[in-house]
Amino acid sequence: MINQKLLFARAYEKEAGAEISADARPVFHMTPQIGWTNDPNGFSYYKGQYHLFYQSNPYDTVWNAMHWGHVVSTDLLHWQYLPCAMAPDEPYDSFGVFSGTAVVLPDGKQLLMYTGVRKEGGDLREEVQTQCVAIGDGLDYHKYEGNPVIDVTKLPEGLSRNDFRDPKIWRDSDGTYRCVVGTCRKNRSGVIVQYCSKDALHWEFESILIENNERFGLMWECPDYFVLDGKQVLLCSPQDMLPEGFEFRNGNGTLCLIGHTDEGKKHFTYEHSQAIDNGIDFYAPQTLMAPDGRRIMIAWMQNWDSCDQQGAKERKWFGQMTLPRELTIENGRLYQRPIRELLQHRSNKVEYKNVLLDGQMTLEGIEGRTVDMEITIRPKDKEKSFQKFALWFAQNEKFRTSLSFKPYEGTLKIDRKFSGSRRAFVHQRRAQVKTNDGELKLRVILDRFSAEVFINDGEQTMTATIMTDLSAQGISFCTDGQVEMDIVKYDLFKE
């Protein structure tokens, strides 16, 4: 039987969400039906559809009282809202149904594994986090009567019961279920623990998969763990990271570790580390394996240090997901590219080749806020490079966001300080990028309220939200020195 708290959330979502017009949302990026969203949850393929659940507060545009919102899609671009999947309606999750993942059971049902949050103590000040499950049919989910399935009694000594969250569950080829969960030691240094189960309901501690040892920030949130191109990959979102060059500048950052496990699959050793995204707004990524074998990732296109609430009350929603991205490992690094399904939504091609830029310039037909651009730049004179190239977009007389490249520094910077956002806010990030004989390739995707930049065929990415008024449709170029550019621009449309 569905709890009254969940029934109320479902009714509220449907009624209040209907008041938001499609024009007030991005075209392709998933936004909450109503209210607030942060982490993607339960990203999975089930019964012929992609399912995406999301951390949701339907009642306001700020974080509070986490529910699981729910959308489905057949192509990862057209999202249909389904009723709220879970509400904080049990004693063990009364202070929040936190993040988790999904797996299909042998009987065809889908199991959601999530973190339930309760409070203890005489003044209810201590937050306790445990792992719980719910089982359903893709629409309605019922919480297991034996929850929590992993209580704090199954934590090794010295690990935090207050920071013990975000289970990633999968089923191995031998039928064993495993999950990894983020936690930390008393000094808050991150630890990933691994559990195993025969039925996804009764769990035992298996190992400490990996310890941070204060190398990459502190607590590691939202772990994802999978095999890609013959390598074992761990994604996580560390808190309180310190910068390393231009990487990990967001405080709450994202980390990719590529390596291997031991023979018993109980311990992970990394060989390569990198930031997943070098922009401003990217957190808590989750992945799935598509039916055609692609590993696809989606993330919260926001950051805890840069939650700009400007205009959120009027829009009645806050937070959006990135475009889904296809992942590969190339040259020992994680590469990301927009899902190929987006190519089917390109129209109105405008192309220029060998354009000479020297100063400020606009090009006829190059404008818009829902566009997909492929840009290649190189110095006109290979013996003497230019000082700077800048792409300005979401531009009018008052506003603009810029993407600028300085070849002598090898840096690419995204900067939204003139986008209309409040001043006391994170505005810019830089990435150290490579050129191929002086040539830099960029793919820039704009979708009304965001920019996603894919550098050198996905070797690096930079992501940022921009809440600039949609009347700012301009795109222009500005250089210090002579730059030769090829550009192809497509409008993006939705049927």
Question: Model segments located where?
Answer:
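Beta-rich carbohydrate-recognition and catalytic domains
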Residues: 1-166, 171-216, 229-278, 301-352, ...
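Beta-rich accessory regions
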Residues: 10-15, 255-281, 286-495
